Design a protein with these regions (language model features):
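N-terminally biased helix-coil "hinge/interface" segments that flank
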Residues: 1-555
Length: 555
């Protein structure tokens, strides 16, 4: 009997399963809430539940494969450490290719003379003096470096020389683009290197926490990490190339869905807390795409299963549209801890919500809370104002945004700390909406209802409340999730068949056909598209959300 424990850490839940590989039988399962401030708590809870139902000794476990959506979620949400990018032999025009400028955001970039020609010969000498000056300036301002050289896949010398100099001066993690891909396309290699550098600290926290729990439980088996193509990496190697795990969780889900459903051809949608991952089965297996993992709008140079990931999930942040006369809601791509869930950990949340509801005038920060995720303390590469705010957040614990940040400048700092993964956000989400409608009742119904009341009374540009009641607000939220999910499925299907990106959602006529039409509406024209394959939905909230989504796409 060959036994393995499969472990998956998502944005909301951590799951474990004990499997007899020889017989293909699941012997025990365990589920715990993912604890983002200390991942070992959720990991330990899930593994402990599995081992409690296992009669054998821990030494009988032969392997522990770990998959995670944390890297996927971080890329989709734009969360991660501050990265310094060195572009060697490129000019500023490189930033306009592969969406590199958008990926960098406010992170620093330096253009260094050097690089190579297509034949591998030196294009220009490497500017060591400029590198040295930049390294000393940035060593206390960033968490990691990314290095991309002109034609580095033909000759990586300037990338490796830059890496060695940065390592000697700063001691920080460094990602070279030629180590991640042998393909041409410098800006896309640079993009992939930036994403990799941002994810290093995140994956290190996860792997270290898992190794500590394994040691506590007496598990001596190898720890492996699932790659985006479904294969396995040794944990130590994964630490140097975390971008390889960017579709780890979706790849594991796809493999599991194919095994359980036994389908030969189908569209698979895995809805989690942060993302929906969409893939296609052909002859029972997914298709691999070399250098083409598509995650949250970024086309990377990572080999992975053909999976498309979008920022739609049960925990997507819901925000009111306050400008204009029509109002409405936006959804995602940022994840927020549901109010109904945070209330279980922090019961005084409901007191804060009630006090906000007692105010005569609604505030934009109503029903919005933050909590610190800084187990190693405040990073010193933050700005002075960000450091002060981070220290205040650690001292306060979970807090209303309005109490932590009383000015627009402070609110901007809060947003930056959230985007760096140092503060967690809690606000109204589709999970809360499902509590209000009664479709899901696992967490705190009262907190969800208070949040819905606060959201419903927010006013649009005409001074009109965006929803007539908490129930209307909840139904608006779920309708938007279902509409956007249906569009994502159809966009993925048409892209899979060569129809281009966003073929449905960018077409006003087709996109309009996915809106929920009131029963009283007398339409003169009806337009629609239909999915012509089986749909397999999985994920914690699939049973709640996918019946209406399937109906929308005609399955």
């Amino acid at each position: 009997m060959s036994l393995v424990i499969g472990l998956d850490t998502g944005g909301t839940y951590t799951d474990a399963a004990l499997l007899d590989v020889d017989r293909g039988v699941v012997l025990a399962t365990g589920k715990a809430l993912t604890t983002r401030d200390d991942l070992s708590v959720g990991l330990g809870g899930a593994i402990a539940k599995v081992l409690a139902d296992f009669d054998g000794a821990p030494e009988e476990i032969k392997m522990l494969p770990l998959s995670t959506t944390l890297a996927t979620n971080a890329v989709v949400e734009g969360v991660g450490g501050r990265v310094g990018l060195f572009l060697i032999g490129f000019d500023e025009a490189a930033l306009e290719r592969a969406d590199l400028a958008r990926a960098l955001g406010q992170d620093p970039v330096y253009f260094i003379n050097g690089g190579h020609r297509p034949d591998g010969g030196i294009q220009a000498p490497l500017d060591i003096a400029a590198l040295d000056a930049a390294a000393h300036k940035l060593k206390s301002e960033v968490s990691a470096f990314a290095v991309a050289g002109h034609f580095a896949t033909r000759n990586p010398l300037h990338e490796t020389e830059t890496r060695d100099l940065l390592r000697d001066i700063t001691g920080l993690p460094i990602t070279c683009s030629h180590e991640l891909s042998s393909s041409l396309g410098g800006p896309r290699r640079a993009l992939t290197a930036v994403l990799n550098a941002r994810l290093i600290n995140l994956l290190e926290r996860l792997i270290t926490a898992t190794q500590n729990i394994m040691a506590q439980q007496g598990l001596t088996c190898p720890l492996m990490v699932v790659k985006g193509d479904g294969s396995l990496l040794q944990a130590d190697f994964a630490l140097s190339r975390p971008v390889e795990t960017v579709l780890s969780g979706p790849a594991a889900s796809l493999s599991g869905a194919a095994f359980l459903a036994g389908a030969k051809s189908a569209l698979i949608a895995d809805i989690g807390g942060t993302t929906t991952d969409i893939a296609f089965l052909h002859n029972g297996t997914p298709r691999l795409k070399k250098d083409a993992a598509f995650v949250g709008g970024w086309q990377t140079m990572v080999e992975a299963a053909e999976i498309r990931t979008c920022g739609l999930g049960g925990d997507s942040e819901v925000a009111p549209i306050l400008r204009g006369r029509t109002g409405g809601l936006t959804l995602g791509p940022r994840r927020a801890t549901p109010l109904s869930l945070l209330a279980l950990r922090w019961p005084s949340l409901k007191d804060h919500l009630s006090r906000q509801l007692d105010l005569a005038v609604p505030m934009a920060t109503d029903a919005r809370f933050v909590f610190p995720i800084m187990p190693d303390g405040v990073p010193q590469w933050l700005t002075r104002s960000e450091i002060r705010l981070a220290e205040k957040a650690i001292a306060a614990g979970p807090s209303p945004v309005a109490e932590l940040a009383a000015t627009q400048l402070a609110l901007g700092a809060v947003d930056r700390l959230i985007s760096r993964g140092l503060l967690g956000l809690s606000s109204f989400t589709p999970t809360d909406a499902a509590h209000v409608t009664g479709a899901f009742t696992e967490f705190d119904d009262e907190a969800a209802m208070l949040g819905a009341k606060l959201m419903a009374r927010q006013r649009n540009g005409a001074g009109i409340a965006i929803a007539a009641s908490p129930l209307d607000l909840a139904e608006m939220t779920l309708d938007e999730l279902h509409r956007r999910s249906a569009l994502a499925l159809m966009d993925a299907a048409l892209a899979h068949e060569g129809g281009g990106e966003a073929a449905v959602s960018s077409n006003p006529l087709l996109a309009q056909s996915f809106r929920k039409i009131p029963a009283s509406n007398d339409q003169l024209v009806s337009v629609g598209v239909k999915l012509n394959t089986d749909l397999i939905a999985l994920g914690a909230s699939a049973a709640t959300h996918y019946p209406p989504i399937a109906n929308t796409v005609g399955v």
